[in-house]
Amino acid sequence: MYLGRVHCSFEVPGLLSGRVGHMSMAVRSVRLACGPRGALLLLLLVLLGVLVVLHKVTQSPLLNQNKILQDHLRGQHERYIQSTRTILLWTEFFGDSRWKLSWDTLGPQELRDELHCPVYQCEISNQNAFLPAVELYDAIVFHAAEMFPLLRPVPSQRSPHQVYVFALMEPPGETKHRLDDEQGFYNLTMTYRIDSDVFWPYGQLLDITADAVVAPSVKPPWRKPPVAFNDSLVWDLWSGKTKTAAWFVSHCETLSKREVLANRLQEFFEVDIYGNCGTLSCTRGDPHCAEMLDTDYFFYLAFENSLCDDYVTEKLFDALERTVIPVVFGGADYSRILPPHSYVDANRFMSVEGLAQYMKLVVADPDLYVSYFWWRSHYRLTYSSPFCDLCARLHDPSFGHKTQFYHDIQSWWFNSCRLQSRIRL
């Protein structure tokens, strides 16, 4: 049936007038001759046009700057996390080319399963040829207690993105480099100092309840010692102990003068000295030596060879594994390392006599002696590889945008030590 010509018109709203994208909307009214299907088609086209315009507006950089930035940073972060970082061990670690690691080259699986690194997408190798060129490594680690290798003192090429790491677990007196010749050479430090870029302690304390490592750190959230504490095992061991103090030592003349302190203590009670500096011997690694501390001795002398910030050695942490109170002597602030009332700090006393008298007091008072072991109910000793920290650092997106340099590594390292102890020797 013929319906005749049907006129239809579409009024374009005035608010769309002007230019949106590349489309001119200046025409306010369009009158077309069309049939019913044409009218429907026209309506669909108009709706499609509106959707296109709205899409262009909502995706405009003028309105979506934050989203564009967020997408970019998120993608960059994912790339940093997923990609593998490579670490080259340039020098040996006291003659050990593997740095006490299990293989010449460790991959992500070993970092995850053996070192238990939370961030493990790294490869560590002592083989220069692991990558085609030395400048391709993300980080190169130099042990400052070793001389540079004679045939290859330093890498011949260095890329801008590459990180050179100053690594040392010993105090500054053990440095075998002329650091005044290495200004601006290192980007990161990996040492026992808490303010190092990569922390390398001899041991750590984990809060059992929080399941988190709390020390060493600048201000550990230590729990308060209880007013009263009882441990039947410690009581039983206390009753069988007969000797005041033991000391295992191999270096007899030191910068800290610890040997003087030990000799002065012998004016007040007997100190059994094992090793090169005494008359007694006990083979390193012999379990009897450790058990002897539990059964025979009230104290163990954890005296350091240098008075340097944060410097404490494995002998302190070894003593914490035994039922013996460590008497500490060093340059560290021990409140940043050990729980309160878990040790006796020689530098808290003005004189050797004052220290000796307090040690005698503790020996004679079983309640006081047992109270020094309260921390075992709340903390346990643990250890993590510094390579876990280094791997995480190399994966940090913020670190990828900047490369710092130590322009005076010598002052940073050497100024952390002193020659004079607080206790008068």
From Swiss-Prot:
It is an enzyme of class 2 (transferase). Residues 59-425 are lumenal. GO terms for cellular component: Golgi cisterna membrane. The keyword Transmembrane helix applies. Residues 1-37 are cytoplasmic. Pfam families: Glyco_tran_10_N, Glyco_transf_10. GO terms for biological process: fucosylation; protein glycosylation. It is a single-pass type II membrane protein. Keywords: Glycoprotein, Glycosyltransferase, Golgi apparatus, Membrane, Signal-anchor, Transferase, Transmembrane, Transmembrane helix. GO terms for molecular function: fucosyltransferase activity. Glycans are attached at residues 187, 230. The chain crosses the membrane at residues 38-58. Its main location: Golgi. Pathway: Protein modification; protein glycosylation. Its EC number is 2.4.1.-. The keyword Acetylation does not apply. It is found in: Golgi apparatus, Golgi stack membrane. InterPro entries: Glyco_tran_10_C, Glyco_tran_10_N, Glyco_trans_10, GT10-like_C_sf. Belongs to the glycosyltransferase 10 family. This is Alpha-(1,3)-fucosyltransferase C.
